[in-house]
Amino acid sequence: MTEESLRPSRLEHAQHPVAIVHEGFFVYANALFLQRLGYRSFDDLQAVPLLDMVDERYHERLREHLDAAKKSAGTEQRHPQTKLTLHRADDLPLSAGCTSFRTRFGGEDCVQLNLTTAGDANLLGRLGALPWRHYLSLLFLLLFTVLPSTLLLKLNINNAPDVYFPDDEPAVVLDRELRTRFPNDQVFVLLFEGVALFSDGFLDAYDGLRRSLEKLPEIDEVVAVTTQDHIAGTQDDFIVEPLIDVRTLAQSRPADRQERVLQDELSKGVMAAADGSALAMVAIPKKSGNSIERLALEEQILAAVQDARLKGYLVAMAGQIPLDVAQLRSMLRDNMIFIPATVATGLTLIWWLFRRWLAVMLAGVAIGVVTNSTVAIYVLLDQPFTLVSSIIPPLLSALTVAALVHLFNGLFIASKLGYSGAERVARAIQEVDRPALFAALTTAGGLASLGTSPIVPIKTFGLISALGTLLIYLVVFRILPNIVVRWDKRPWTNVRGSAHLVDGIVSALYRFGIRQPALVIGMVCVLLALGAPQLRNVVVETNLQEFFDFNHPVREQTRYIEDKLVGTMAVSVIFDADARDGLKDPRTLQLIRDFQQWSKAQPEIDRSFGLPDFVQEMHWAFNAENPAFRQLPDDRELITQYLLIYDGEDIYDFVDRDFQHSQIALNINVHSANDISRVLENIREYLRDNVGDALRWEIAGNGRLFADMEDLLVSGQVYSLWGALVLIFVFMLFFLRSFWAALLCMIPNLSPIFLIFVIMGLTGIWLDMATAMIASVAIGIAVDDTIHV
């Protein structure tokens, strides 16, 4: 590139007003010159002769000065100087010193004018002439690159089920109250298989693992066959002892221990497989904790298994917490893949379209600033970063690339029109700023509509991603142009085979649409008619197990444990009496026992366990283990006596010490929200018909929370869609100032939603937490294209 072609770019960054004149007319002026003379653009200045701009008293002085300047080369150390009074565009006078010399511009001999005003002569004026916008923009990018990165170290990564519900949700309030009395139902279930499971060596190692886990500060209780209460009968009494007492292993044989475990009614199906081929251990945390804490706890448990030399025996681990940990690992792995892939794809696209390293570097910086700053908002607002939140980085990366393409395309067009430097940037911004602003507002509106969702992570995602969209506009159309003015010196040239290919495809499509409107509209109507019936096939369903492949370890291990033992989905049915000791009433216990018998007959319920099981086992043991007495006694005083004699602890996991509040723990073998909802509705129907007002009852637990999420999801989807459509219509109405035009523009905004649900109905994709957000996101992205059209 020649020195002459580089000169305007250098003059743009000069710290004083500079202009070039040829034959008395301006052929170039930098931004400072236009600013000092009060002109908005060079187009306004170009038509004004230099002589008309100078006060009439100085015309002769100007002519003499220009003649002298034509004889002075730019390389000389001293150049002709003079003082002039110029007329600004607003007719105000401007006194300035003028230093001029001969230069080349556009292949012609010209004169370069360098002005020095009163403001430029003093320190404040010189400081004011510095490119502060450039410096401040660089400072902004630096700060918003560094500061968010420090905040991200405090990011609370938490995908635990608790964070998905509002605090005042009835199921949450009920579960919170339940956990004040009874242990957590989100647990680790460990299953061991191998030879000689009931041998001295294995049981010693097994109990050693139990003791190690109990020492962990995060663990509240460990349920194992070596600590589980076993109620044994005598001739006139009963005793409570460990199911297997490791202190007395020498007094028993492995076969006897196995038979004792398999025949124990309190642990049947829970602590051992029916054929004795597997033993279980259940670790119950003190609190749920966030996902990172759960991951750390799982690793501690596995380390304890390793230390106990039982790793070869551990064949499966399941429960809500291992499932959450698997989701966390999947989320982190996917983010490590898709975020770099999205950024790399975007940067490759920028290079392919424009072949300009400056554009690629600015795109990388912009994507980093936008995504890091937006995710850092989670830290500032003390909100958990969930599986839902992980959509933000790739989404905002893609939206940032889209905005950058508009900016760079504007610069390319301005360059083709002959603009350079600040004028090129100003022309590009003038072309794209208004549609870019409305696109940002409407896209943010579509995302913010998710703020109406009652599911907290979806609401937070919508509001924070909306802020991120507005940040894209600020960075791309307000910050980066100041950088481009400083560093963009070369013209933007046509790129063979890239932008031409895209333009060719777009041109072919719109030409076909304009030439064949009836055919296009007819085809669209036919497709709508064919797709509409599929909307009825959209199924609202969530199954966390289905988030993983069928052969994923967490699904395989869950299936294996449920085949060997019982279902891992926990539901608690609460029964409360009106007064203390109310649950000692035989009629009350029989009502609860009848419910248990009914629930055990349901195919989805593998186990129903609670206070009546303990009382029944005490009655059986007290009567010399006579099978005829394995039932509830009908004498309140006898029940009271049994409970007084009982000196174990396991019963208090199911009833409080006042015998007023109790829970029946159900183990369910289904995991989808709809299946769980059907089970819960059947339970409610039974309790309404058979218990009624005789006892206060309610359903709680992890299963209830998960099932209620379905209703929240549906209501949130309806509210967010309507909110997005109304908000975008208002934006369109304001932008177009026409009701019918705004209504017409809603068609391309609704089309992606319609297509999404048609595809979901056709392919059987569920409407769950992940797909529920796609509609609102699609509206926001679709309206971007509508605005630009």
Spans of model-derived segments:
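PAS-family sensory/regulatory domains
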Residues: D44-R57
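Short loop/turn elements at sensory-signaling interfaces that couple input to output
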Residues: C98-N114
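Interfacial helix-loop-helix hairpins and adjacent transmembrane helices
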Residues: D120-L142, A426, L474-L528
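Solvent-exposed, non-transmembrane loop/terminal regulatory segments of multi-pass membrane proteins
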Residues: L153-A196, L203, L249-M271, Y510-I514, ...
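Extracytoplasmic
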Residues: R176, T180, T248-W357, Q590-R593, ...
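Interfacial segments of transmembrane alpha-helices in multi-pass membrane proteins
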Residues: L332-F385, S453-V456, Y719-G764
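Transmembrane alpha-helices and their membrane-interface boundaries in multi-pass membrane transporters
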Residues: L380, S397-N409, D433-T452, P457-S498, ...
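Helix-loop junctions and hydrophobic alpha-helical segments within the transmembrane domains
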Residues: A414-L441
